[in-house]
């Protein structure tokens, strides 16, 4: 067998075939080294495609790339920002996160991976990723490698200095972007404070702040986003974290916060469409809508189960 690296990994993972444990160890180490170089608010230049939650829906992630003009390649020069929640709930969290990591290694300056509330040891032990790794590898080793990568994911990205991209939302502890830049991010998602709020908070039709029903983060209102954007010279906050049936939604009359949701037919039953937000040099967002793949995760999983059942009787 020849030397295996990102090119071989990409060909394999594109077919939804998970990598060996030793390949995963090597991949996670490479990604960690790249992420260590990034700041808490990673600057990204337009043109860029912004993507919301994926939640382990691997075949829909492939559809996302088709909708956005293809996987990053030497020909496709678009930048991509992913807003977190790569894992849990879907059947192929492992393959989803692996594909994104391989693309990060191949095109480090074109793929920006932001941390979501599900990129956490505690949450993945409840919502599926831990169990998936255990089932697919027979141990928790690969889950541990991935969790180490989670700890180094950036907290935010900023497009041309004007569009802030985070997973969840704002925090009463953060008024200035510089307060995000100095947070210590190489750790498990905390239960409270600025870091926690960035991945857990939601916009709501209120004036300022309210307690979040999620039990972490806050609800923030139009006055909060208006002041935050004014102080930091921003024109828009792009975030994910909440299912929107129509794929994207602007909040508040100023339209200064937008939710981008990229998991179609969420959990294989919600019936929603998904979107990506494309931003050109004029910084005008353009949304591309896509639907779940017909022969997607469910049929692949069912076929695998049938194969296992037939093998059992051989």
UniProtKB/Swiss-Prot annotation:
GO cellular component: a single term: chromatin
Chief site of localization: cytoplasm
Gene3D superfamilies documented for this protein: 3.60.21.10
Reaction(s) catalysed (UniProt annotation): O-phospho-L-seryl-[protein] + H2O = L-seryl-[protein] + phosphate; O-phospho-L-threonyl-[protein] + H2O = L-threonyl-[protein] + phosphate
Location relative to the cell: Cytoplasm
Cofactor note: Binds 2 manganese ions per subunit.
Single GO MF annotation: protein serine/threonine phosphatase activity
Active-site residues, as the UniProt record annotates them: 118
Cross-referenced Pfam families: Metallophos
Membrane-crossing segments per the record: none
Record's keyword terms, sorted: Cell cycle, Cell division, Cytoplasm, Hydrolase, Manganese, Metal-binding, Mitosis, Protein phosphatase, Virulence
InterPro entries in the record: Calcineurin-like_PHP_ApaH, Metallo-depent_PP-like, PPA2-like, Ser/Thr-sp_prot-phosphatase
Cofactor: Mn(2+)
Binding site for Mn(2+) 2: 85, 117, 167, 241
Family: Belongs to the PPP phosphatase family. PP-6 (PP-V) subfamily.
Its job: Serine/threonine protein phosphatase which is involved in the dephosphorylation of the large subunit of RNA polymerase II. Is required in late G1 for normal G1 cyclin expression, bud initiation and expression of certain genes that are periodically expressed during late G1. Plays a role during hyphal growth through the regulation of cell wall biogenesis, osmosensing and protein translation. Involved in virulence in a mouse systemic infection model.
Subunit structure, interactors included: Interacts with MDS3.
PANTHER family registered for this protein in UniProt: SERINE/THREONINE-PROTEIN PHOSPHATASE PP2A-RELATED
Protein name: Serine/threonine-protein phosphatase SIT4
Species this chain originates from: Candida albicans (strain SC5314 / ATCC MYA-2876) (Yeast)
